[in-house]
């Protein structure tokens, strides 16, 4: 199993120390109900080699060895990493292995990063962090501490495998809880919520919970699906959206900024809009499932398979 005690020690003397009132018990309860494959995945993750010669988190997530692994060892590493499929967020370059993930998450980071308040020395929360790709990029920007939350057991084990291959780097930590399970800490300088809002049945509650984690004046980075339209336009799919069951509300940018104002955020502004392309989300050998090409109308890629507007995403910044 994955040991969270080093994280408890890290935050014990920090302004996150109040979290220790609830977190250890929550994680004990989480382990009791974890996925039946969690122990197997965790064993794979925690047995990864931990001695890279150097790491690069500035323009990619990379761990380099002075000498290439012998081919047999490299193939065994690939075999073990593929036991943790599907790999959705990345890519990773680890000990000579290129994990070519479904999403080119570096594309999103290139869209987001230029607009952010500098992350250097900040304490950061990444909500719905997946396997933690963007957390490592935040570390690469000299963040003081990055905490990701995502309740998915496989993502936790992918994150721990990457952490090991990066030399057991402790500047980022993934906690397998949902945002609604966190006590309001008001302790993070920057809070990210990327690709989460449209999965929430109550988006305003989600925004309020994000605000409760920020220090006064802290920065929210909200990246989500949007539609074209004015302040009154919000898409509520009748059934599925791009084959996803759990998509509830997709607002226009104007509607989304209005939501943020209602929650009490200040200086809400849209800094980027982009249509999701087949270059950014696609099937690879590290993902056996369907991907974006299967979710779009084969005769008109401006629409989803259900006839709704194809995925378009916006980055919104606001301050608590």
Curated annotation (Swiss-Prot):
Entry-linked Gene3D superfamilies: Vaccinia Virus protein VP39
Main EC class the enzyme belongs to: transferase
EC number: 2.5.1.-
Ranges in coiled-coil conformation: none
Subunit text: Homotetramer.
Keywords for this protein: Transferase, tRNA processing
Source species: Haemophilus ducreyi (strain 35000HP / ATCC 700724)
NCBIfam families: PRK15068.1, tRNA 5-methoxyuridine(34)/uridine 5-oxyacetic acid(34) synthase CmoB
Protein's recorded name: tRNA U34 carboxymethyltransferase
Family, similarity comment: Belongs to the class I-like SAM-binding methyltransferase superfamily. CmoB family.
UniProt xrefs under PANTHER family: METHYLTRANSFERASE, TRNA U34 CARBOXYMETHYLTRANSFERASE
Summary of the function given for this chain in its UniProt record: Catalyzes carboxymethyl transfer from carboxy-S-adenosyl-L-methionine (Cx-SAM) to 5-hydroxyuridine (ho5U) to form 5-carboxymethoxyuridine (cmo5U) at position 34 in tRNAs.
Any one GO molecular-function label of the UniProt entry: transferase activity, transferring alkyl or aryl (other than methyl) groups
Binding site for carboxy-S-adenosyl-L-methionine: 89, 103, 108, 128, 150-152, 179-180, 194, 198, 313
GO biological process: tRNA wobble uridine modification
HAMAP family: tRNA_carboxymethyltr_CmoB
Catalyzed reactions per annotation: carboxy-S-adenosyl-L-methionine + 5-hydroxyuridine(34) in tRNA = 5-carboxymethoxyuridine(34) in tRNA + S-adenosyl-L-homocysteine + H(+)
């Amino acid at each position: 199993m994955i040991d969270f005690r080093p994280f408890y020690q890290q935050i014990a003397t920090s302004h996150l120390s109040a979290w220790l009132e609830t977190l250890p018990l929550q994680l004990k309860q989480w382990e009791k109900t974890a996925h039946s494959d969690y122990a197997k995945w965790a064993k794979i993750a925690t047995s990864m080699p931990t001695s890279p010669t150097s790491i690069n988190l500035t323009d990619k997530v990379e761990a380099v060895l002075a000498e290439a692994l012998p081919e047999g060892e490299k193939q065994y590493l690939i075999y073990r990493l593929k036991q943790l499929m599907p790999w959705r967020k990345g890519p990773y370059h680890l000990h000579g292995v290129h994990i070519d993930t479904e999403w080119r998450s570096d594309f999103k980071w290139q869209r987001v990063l230029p607009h952010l308040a500098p992350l250097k020395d900040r304490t950061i929360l990444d909500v719905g962090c997946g396997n933690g790709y963007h957390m490592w990029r935040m570390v690469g920007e000299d963040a003081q501490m990055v905490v990701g939350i995502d309740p998915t057991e496989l993502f936790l084990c992918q994150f721990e495998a990457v952490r090991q291959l990066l030399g057991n780097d402790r500047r980022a930590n993934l906690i397998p809880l949902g945002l609604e399970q966190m006590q309001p800490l008001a302790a993070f300088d920057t809070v990210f919520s990327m690709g989460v809002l449209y999965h929430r049945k109550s988006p305003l509650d989600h925004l309020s919970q994000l605000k409760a984690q920020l220090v006064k004046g802290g920065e929210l980075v909200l990246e989500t699906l949007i539609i074209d339209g004015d302040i009154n336009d919000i898409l509520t799919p009748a059934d599925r959206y791009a084959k996803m069951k759990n998509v509830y509300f997709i607002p226009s940018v104007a509607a989304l900024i209005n939501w943020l104002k209602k929650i009490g955020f200040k200086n809400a502004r849209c800094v980027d809009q982009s249509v999701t392309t087949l270059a950014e989300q696609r099937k690879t050998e590290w993902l056996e499932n369907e991907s974006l090409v299967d979710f779009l109308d084969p005769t008109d890629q401006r629409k989803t398979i259900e006839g709704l507007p194809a995925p378009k995403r916006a980055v919104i910044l606001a301050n608590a």
